[in-house]
Amino acid sequence: MSRARDAGCVAAGIVIGASAWYCVYKYTRGKDQKKKRLTKPKNRASVGTGSRARAGLRAGFTIDLGPGFSPPNPVDIEIMNKAQGEASNLATTVAEEVAPAAPSPKVQNGAESKVQELNGAKTEANLESVVMPSATCTVTPPPKVAGGLTAAEAPEIIGAPKVLEAPSTTEASGAVAAPGPTVSPMIAQTPGPVVPSPTIVSTGPAAIPWAVAHPGAVQSPGPAVPPMAVQSLVPAAPSWAVVAPPGAVYIPVAAHFAGPAAASRVTQSPGTVIPPLPPPSSVLPRGVPSVPGRTVQSPGAAVHPVAAQSTGVVVPPRAVQYSGAAVTSGGAAVPSGGAATPRAAASTQRTASTEVMQVPRVAAATEATETPRIGTPAMVAEASLPVHSGAAENPGTSGSSKTAATGKKAAPGAHTGAIPKAGSATGAVPKGGGGKGGNKNRSGGKGKNRKNKVDVDELGMGFRPGDGAAAAAAASANGGQAFLAEIPESEEGESGWTDTESDSDSEPDVPQRGKGKRTIPMHKRPFPYEIDEILGVRDLRKVLALLQKSDDPFIQQVALLTLSNNANYSCNQETIRKLGGLPIIANMINKTDPHIKEKALMAMNNLSENYENQGRLQVYMNKVMDDIMASNLNSAVQVVGLKFLTNMTITNDYQHLLVNSIANFFRLLSQGGGKIKVEILKILSNFAENPDMLKKLLGTQVPSSFSSLYNSYVESEILINALTLFEIIFDNLRAEVFNYREFNKGSLFYLCTTSGVCVKKIRALANHHDLLVKVKVIKLVNKF
């Protein structure tokens, strides 16, 4: 405990003194330097023989590793590049004067003095690039090689190649072993039993191509703890120059060659410059065994003395990486964006527990040798460049561009962004089904073209063949009213009917699972059945084709009713005409079935509201009049037929076609019911407004019961229409001079004169209870 306390005091004094010296030195020397504009960091690394490797910094990227870690400080890329270039030149110059063996403390001090004399002003850049407040131990290998960073180096070193420039960030190569007892910051481990090195963990944002132990670094105790900070060195130092910050201990990485390590030990003073000689690539054997290096550790992390890990160490599940990549130790790249699986094979004696982080594009040694290890499983993400695990790698495998990546096994659409095919999980609804009831059509089945107990005819309309005969039989037993099965409204968009063809060839028919066949309950009610949906062009064409092809009365009635309801809209009136539906519908009045005739007349009545359609339907006016007279009195055919003729006689263009039917209208007027009377009075009023038809109308012999229409007990609707007819005729009689001799007695002319019977009855209606009738009567009386 006393040794640890003394060592801590000494370390604290060194840190305080070095900090004061550094502040004074920076203040005195910093005035002469000019500020340079920072260049934009490049996010690439170029590697070549004799050229410096440059790597960009992803600035502004921070990762929260917990309350015990602080965010990395920003790194000046320009200063670091300048420092590395100067360190490279300095290493080449000083290497000629330094022996290959590890120098003594005096030699190192002399080298430091020489370097300071040669580059006094340039040392500040090196110190700024080395001293990082939050990075206590950073290790970065040369670029694009999957070599082990802490692999042991050979004692023989020939030549001094150019120094590689360190990237701006540090990469954590593996997991850190479980924490153990801490040691004084300046105490390094003595060479003991050789153990495979665990991984190198760094919390700082920048890395330099040497290992620097910060005064605050905590390491686990080795076999022996010397009182001073001593580190064993191999005969040849690594292939780069080191400018240690004040109070830092130089911990070189072991050589890549096999051989006995030098027993010389060097204690470094603050600011010492180490000019080692790098080994040439020609001397590096491929298959030599590797000597494990020592552990370099960041502050706050303690390593167990016996914790040893191989190159197959896998990043723990909680590892946070800058590039989002977890890479195997053998240089295998893993997919980006994924997390390493906790079940990855790793030959370790202790389980790593400390969180680590990874920085993209970390360079590796150019001639690293590897030992066979188990790679990371294929469930982790792929990285752009290989990462090192801290131990030697497979012989003969280098981290060049030929480095093989482990295959990944991703779920479909998980990482690739591929959209899965349309199915039940995608939410795509096929055209044959709706939202509320699933993909059920009118037949009660699942999806299109499905059948259940309710058979579907060959045209796919969802009606049972042969129901027409049953409907006719039911009609005869029900007083002429046919009972038809209620068909539920469709949920298939515009059509309102089951689609027998796919709207689009590209839409797959997705069957719905887990739903059995269900029979739609058949609720019966009399016609007419109203469908509120407005059909489109395609659906109207389908209904017209169905009406033309089917011989089933049931289907014909429903199709005509559908067309009739849709013909109420002006847009569909034109659409049906353009589709050639007018003759198809009009030909249905030739059917002997009164229900089919009625539905056809209803459709024709709605279609006749369009003037262009009237030109196509005028040829059917006499046929409709014949059907009216041949039908039962007060039947639906008569009422609907008269409504059709009312629309056709609104204009004067086609009234002459019914000039021979005026007497029949008066006969129906005297015999028919209220609806018949109303429609006939409207037709006669249209005739009265046409001067060409007025003379024919006035000369018609009318029944004596015609004057009874102006009695007070008559329904108000009938009475109002009768008063309207009389007003039109009376106005025309006052406007024109008619010869009385041209009209016979009993004609309409004599009934409408001022001395006629109708005028007397109209005067008696002045006290009628209906206000509209009373107003109408007063208006007429003022004209008498």
From Swiss-Prot:
Cell compartments where the protein resides: Mitochondrion; Mitochondrion outer membrane
Pfam families assigned to the protein according to its UniProt record, in alphabetical order: Arm_2
Tissue distribution: Widely expressed in the adult nervous tissue, especially in the forebrain, including the cerebral cortex, hippocampus and thalamus.
Annotated transmembrane regions: 7-27
Residues in ARM repeats: 528-568, 570-609, 650-689
Keywords of this entry: Membrane, Mitochondrion, Mitochondrion outer membrane, Repeat, Signal-anchor, Transmembrane, Transmembrane helix
Coiled coil (residue ranges): none
Region (Disordered): 328-353, 388-461, 488-522
Region (Mitochondrion outer membrane (MOM)-targeting sequence): 1-6, 26-40
Keyword match Hydrolase: no
GO CC, any one term: mitochondrial outer membrane
Residue spans of biased composition, Low complexity class: 396-418
Superkingdom classification of source: Eukaryota
Membrane topology: Single-pass membrane protein
Chain intervals with Acidic residues compositional bias: 488-508
Similarity comment: family membership: Belongs to the eutherian X-chromosome-specific Armcx family.
Free-text function comment from the UniProt entry: May regulate the dynamics and distribution of mitochondria in neural cells.
Protein name: Armadillo repeat-containing X-linked protein 2
Source organism (scientific name): Mus musculus
Recorded name of the encoding gene: Armcx2
